[in-house]
């Protein structure tokens, strides 16, 4: 199993993985986002984990000026992280996050953060297993004007 930066040729398989993590809307929506990503500057990478069967996971990264519980103004952020069920508990997620942290360090970040839905206990457990600490739960609100 290898971890590498996603390439244009990965867009179809990566769109399906993104849809498994974020199922709202069709796979084509994710494909469109990826097409725009690959056509743009790619300031932050998408990492993919690949084995003989194809892509088995991904990690989408960014730099944020603020993240809950962080003290610096340039925080490496794990925007999305997914491993197919058949490849879980085999070190794939750990390798993706290690590569993500290495990238964040390489661009000058000294903190790395992530988030998850408040009721997603499996994600919370996975984050904790990789050394993340809980820094709080928030509720977000909106209304039409």
Task: Give a label for each model feature.
Residues 48, 54-63, 77, 82:
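Conserved beta-strand in the GNAT
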Residues 26-47:
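Active-site rim helix/loop that mediates acceptor-substrate recognition in acyltransferases
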Residues 72-85, 139:
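Conserved acetyl-CoA binding element of GNAT-fold acetyltransferases
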Residues 79, 83, 89-102, 125, ...:
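Conserved acetyl-CoA-binding loop-helix of GNAT-fold acetyltransferases
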Residues 2-14:
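A short beta-loop-alpha structural element at the N-terminal edge
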Residues 97, 104-116:
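Conserved GNAT acetyl-CoA-binding A-motif
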Residues 15-29, 69:
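Helix-loop element at the rim of GNAT/NAT acetyltransferase active sites that forms part
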């Amino acid at each position: 199993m290898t971890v590498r930066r996603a390439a244009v040729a990965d867009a179809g398989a990566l769109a399906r993985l993104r849809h498994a993590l974020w199922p709202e809307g069709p796979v084509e929506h994710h494909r469109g986002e990826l097409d725009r990503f690959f056509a743009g500057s790619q300031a932050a990478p998408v990492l993919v984990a690949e084995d003989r069967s194809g892509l088995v996971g991904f990690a989408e990264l960014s730099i944020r000026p603020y993240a809950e519980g962080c003290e610096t103004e340039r925080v490496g952020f794990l925007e999305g992280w997914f491993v197919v069920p058949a490849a879980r508990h085999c070190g794939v997620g750990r390798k993706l996050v290690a590569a993500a942290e290495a990238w964040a360090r390489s661009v000058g970040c000294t903190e790395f953060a992530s988030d998850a839905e408040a009721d997603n206990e499996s994600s919370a457990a996975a984050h904790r297993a990789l050394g993340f600490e809980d820094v709080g739960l928030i509720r977000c609100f909106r209304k039409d004007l």
